[in-house]
Amino acid sequence: MEKNQEFIVTIEDMNEDGAGVGKVDGYIWFVKDAVIGDVVRAKAMKMKKSYGFARLMQVLEPSASRVVPSCPVARQCGGCQLQAMSYEEQLKFKERKVMNNLIRIGKFDEDEIHMLPIMGMEQPWRYRNKAQFPFGKDKDGNVIAGFYAGRTHAIVEAEDCLLGVEENREILDIVKRFMKEMKIEPYDELSHKGLVRHVLIRKGFKTDEIMVCLVINGNKLPGKERLVEMLTGGDGVKGMTSISYSVNQEKTNVIMGKEIVNLYGPGYITDYIGNVKYQISPLSFYQVNPVQTELLYGTALEYAGLTGNEIVWDLYCGIGTISLFLAQKAKKVYGVEIVPQAIEDARRNAEINGIHNAEFFAGKAEEVLPEQFEKNHVHADVIVVDPPRKGCDAVCLDTILKMRPERVVYVSCDSATLARDLRYLADGGYVVERGRCCDMFPGTVHVETAVLLVRNG
């Protein structure tokens, strides 16, 4: 087989990134956009010794699980890997992915782990409360906004995203008209010239409050009063609450700058998860799917088994989303987060909700927890962890084992590191009692999982 040669392959499996997997004469091929059960014609693009990557050219026999993607740019955009798969099959794929990692990486037996059915969405569209659109130009020099094509920084023009809120289209149209009227150029990565880099849009699902923040390659936004007028006036956007710009003059892939200049409104929007109110600024971390977040955190709260007498540690707590949920049922909650801005938000959110039994520490979980345990002899009945994709630090896990809480609730966004860390805790005297996946990101390969571990003896 040579590069650019075409061949026919039956897709028998899918890898963790959502690419179809098939074999030709014992050689493994990964075919993006193919679905289990498809028979496809593919073109060889890149080959290694025992496997290769191929481009989907034609679906010859569609799988029973294949559907027509609802999004017109599904294949070009890097955002959704599973749109060609029925939602029912997406959920099965995610459950299988988690279980496979628990068996393969965690070395658990399948009957050792009681996994409850995945929590899917009734409506797996329009679920994202946050969108970030890069700006650029098309080949004719017109200002465009959209998304980056997979693994590139080439902008795929898209006036809307079916995962985002319907107001996105309206806001993008206004921003493009504003730029044309004020003769403002979009940012160009190669030359580091041009002003508007991105537009950040956030919406409170329970409050209908909307935020717009332009990310600019400069200190000033010309015609800022006109932008406010266009977004808030008679033909503006309903629910517009906060308008600002973020200064980012660095040559970087990081979207937001550190300085936010407020143009209109209080500088934040509010939203609720359950009955807890949150203030969300342009730089705040906040779960992008609030509907499923409520289910996921509800599961974590249930697993914590709180009676009102417990001391709880919430590690990697972000802006305190889980902490404040737990504080309503616990005696005391301690939250730990590495990002100082997030801790400021957490303290403010506790104050807004009249929650006085939550205390927050800014620092690394693997430094704060051992220090509090060894120097101040703090106690924990329950420890909740919600780490980034890389999972928990070994020092952090060792300290959890030394503290010997009755229960550990592990909330994970990466089932590979989840499996690794669960094995570590299981070898240290904990039993994996039950777990449940939650589909926070329909259409994509990502899945969240909550697991309860109970101290053995």
PLM region descriptions:
Residues 20-25, 146-149, 213-215, 346:
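Short, acidic/hydrophobic/Gly-rich beta-strand patch recurrent on exposed beta strands
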Residues 37, 164, 289:
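Short, conserved phosphate/pyrophosphate- and ester-handling motifs at nucleotide-, phospho-/glycolipid
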Residues 12, 126-138, 143-149, 201-204, ...:
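Short beta-strand elements
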Residues 201, 208-217, 277-281, 382:
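Short, aliphatic-rich beta-strand segments
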Residues 116-123, 189, 198, 202, ...:
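Short, solvent-exposed loop/turn elements at beta->coil junctions and helix N-caps
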Residues 2-6, 16, 222-457:
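Rossmann-like S-adenosyl-L-methionine
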Residues 57-69, 75-186, 206, 221:
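Extended interfacial segments that mediate partner engagement and assembly in macromolecular machines
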Residues 1-73, 109, 359, 367:
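Terminal RNA-binding accessory module
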